[in-house]
């Protein structure tokens, strides 16, 4: 099975894989090279998850803005 890029995964799948990696790393039975690969993957997953959360927070802020007369516009995460 091919490993998905973190940015192409759902937030829930990202958290699930990250949780699994943490369990494996905490177990301590991995060779150093395997542990380092899993750590690098975990960092990529954590960063992707943080990006997804930031995007969601921005969308919620837009929806809850106090200006009821403001026109709605599409959210574009690349604009930041």
Curated annotation (Swiss-Prot):
<keyword id="KW-0269">Exonuclease</keyword>
<keyword id="KW-0378">Hydrolase</keyword>
<dbReference type="GO" id="GO:0006308">
    <property type="term" value="P:DNA catabolic process"/>
</dbReference>
<dbReference type="GO" id="GO:0009318">
    <property type="term" value="C:exodeoxyribonuclease VII complex"/>
</dbReference>
<dbReference type="InterPro" id="IPR037004">
    <property type="entry name" value="Exonuc_VII_ssu_sf"/>
</dbReference>
<keyword id="KW-0540">Nuclease</keyword>
<keyword id="KW-0963">Cytoplasm</keyword>
<comment type="function">
    <text>Bidirectionally degrades single-stranded DNA into large acid-insoluble oligonucleotides, which are then degraded further into small acid-soluble oligonucleotides.</text>
</comment>
<protein>
    <recommendedName>
        <fullName>Exodeoxyribonuclease 7 small subunit</fullName>
        <ecNumber>3.1.11.6</ecNumber>
    </recommendedName>
</protein>
<dbReference type="GO" id="GO:0008855">
    <property type="term" value="F:exodeoxyribonuclease VII activity"/>
</dbReference>
<dbReference type="InterPro" id="IPR003761">
    <property type="entry name" value="Exonuc_VII_S"/>
</dbReference>
<comment type="similarity">
    <text>Belongs to the XseB family.</text>
</comment>
<comment type="subunit">
    <text>Heterooligomer composed of large and small subunits.</text>
</comment>
<dbReference type="Pfam" id="PF02609">
    <property type="entry name" value="Exonuc_VII_S"/>
</dbReference>
<dbReference type="GO" id="GO:0005829">
    <property type="term" value="C:cytosol"/>
</dbReference>
């Amino acid at each position: 099975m091919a490993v998905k890029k973190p940015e192409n995964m759902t937030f829930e799948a990202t958290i699930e894989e990250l949780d699994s990696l943490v369990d494996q790393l905490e177990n301590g039975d991995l060779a150093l090279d395997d542990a380092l690969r899993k750590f690098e993957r975990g960092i990529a997953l954590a960063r992707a998850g943080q990006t997804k959360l930031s995007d969601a927070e921005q969308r919620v802020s837009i929806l809850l803005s106090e200006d009821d007369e403001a026109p709605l516009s599409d959210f574009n995460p690349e604009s930041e």
